[in-house]
């Protein structure tokens, strides 16, 4: 179903279901022979949600059934796992660096099923604010409570749609704009209209005192190339068709959830406002972690640019 200005979702619906796909990929990587990451909570989320297209990453029977129906699906499924593993490792390392730099205030925007508040070694005094749709945060909190999980930091949930006045809600929840913050916008911006993306980073910039950090992945060069998008959509249709036959449910079209619009170049925008910015393309990031996407699979994963930035202290 196409997006609307005021749409909302639970964890198995619309944008919420994409968080399950990401968690399933993290679970598959964690359980692999040579994992880049260790996320013991990812499998818990996937199992609690039941079967869906995300199950093809973690359910060997469903994966075998899908690849029997369409043998060409095995490669793009593995490529997506590699992508999510590298993405997760990159942002894990980012937060370890911010902690080493003395930042004790963390904001995870559209946190979905991010489990870093539970699994990273946060220094004493760290406060992690998670912002997302109310139903998504409730699913995560309830699922982890049922398994006796305890956050490794002070955790503050801020249930709000990022199209609303989230800075006001964040400060009401205890965020202190006079202190440095480590911001994360992972896997978020392509689900926002271009103007909403601009507003998001304007708000982050306004709330960031010197010593703050920011990390995000944003659409990379060629993201809107019509031929590339056509091939990617064809791959996704095949995956949805196989999943629908195996789990006997309607599988939503993820392409309907993205906003294919020209966007402000985030890295340049931040530099213009005094941030020290570094970037890495997806192939560069995968190579850093010993993974790659073969040429035949380049359309399975949209181009991404990974951005990390620091606001100078003087």
From Swiss-Prot:
Enzyme class: transferase
Protein name according to UniProt: Putative S-adenosyl-L-methionine-dependent methyltransferase Rv3767c
GO biological process, any: methylation
UniProt similarity note: Belongs to the UPF0677 family.
UniProt keyword annotation of Methyltransferase present: yes
Cellular component annotations (GO), alphabetically ordered: plasma membrane
Organism, scientific name: Mycobacterium tuberculosis (strain ATCC 25618 / H37Rv)
Keywords: Methyltransferase, S-adenosyl-L-methionine, Transferase
Functional note: Exhibits S-adenosyl-L-methionine-dependent methyltransferase activity.
Coiled-coil ranges per UniProt: none
Gene3D superfamilies the record matches: Vaccinia Virus protein VP39
């Amino acid at each position: 179903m196409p997006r609307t200005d005021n749409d909302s979702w639970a964890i198995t619906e619309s944008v919420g279901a994409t968080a399950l796909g990401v968690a399933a990929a993290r679970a598959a990587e964690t359980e692999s022979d040579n994992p880049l990451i260790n996320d013991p909570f990812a499998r818990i989320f996937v199992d609690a949600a039941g079967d869906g297209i995300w199950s093809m990453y973690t359910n060997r029977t469903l994966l075998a059934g899908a690849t029997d129906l369409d043998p060409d699906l095995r490669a793009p499924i593995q490529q997506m796992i590699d992508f999510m593993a590298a993405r997760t490792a990159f942002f894990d390392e980012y937060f370890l660096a911010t902690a080493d730099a003395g930042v004790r205030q963390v904001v995870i925007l559209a946190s979905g099923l991010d489990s870093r508040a539970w699994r990273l070694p946060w220094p004493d005094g760290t406060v992690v604010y998670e912002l997302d749709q109310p139903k998504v945060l409730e699913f995560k909190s309830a699922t982890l409570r049922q398994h006796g999980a305890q956050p490794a930091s002070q955790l503050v949930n801020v249930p709000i749609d990022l199209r609303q006045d989230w800075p006001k809600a964040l400060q009401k929840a205890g965020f202190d704009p006079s202190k440095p913050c480590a911001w994360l916008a992972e896997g978020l911006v392509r689900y926002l209209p271009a103007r909403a993306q601009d507003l998001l980073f304007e708000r982050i910039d306004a709330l960031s005192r010197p010593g703050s950090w920011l990390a995000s992945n944003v659409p990379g060069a060629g993201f809107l190339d019509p031929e590339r998008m056509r091939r990617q959509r064809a791959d996704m249709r095949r995956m949805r068709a196989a999943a629908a036959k195996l789990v006997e449910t309607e599988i939503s079209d993820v392409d309907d959830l993205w906003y294919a619009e020209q966007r402000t170049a985030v890295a340049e925008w931040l530099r213009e406002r005094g941030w020290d910015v570094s970037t890495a393309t997806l192939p560069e990031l995968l190579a850093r972690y010993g993974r790659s996407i073969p040429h035949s699979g380049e359309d399975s994963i949209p181009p991404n640019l990974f951005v990390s930035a620091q606001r100078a202290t003087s």
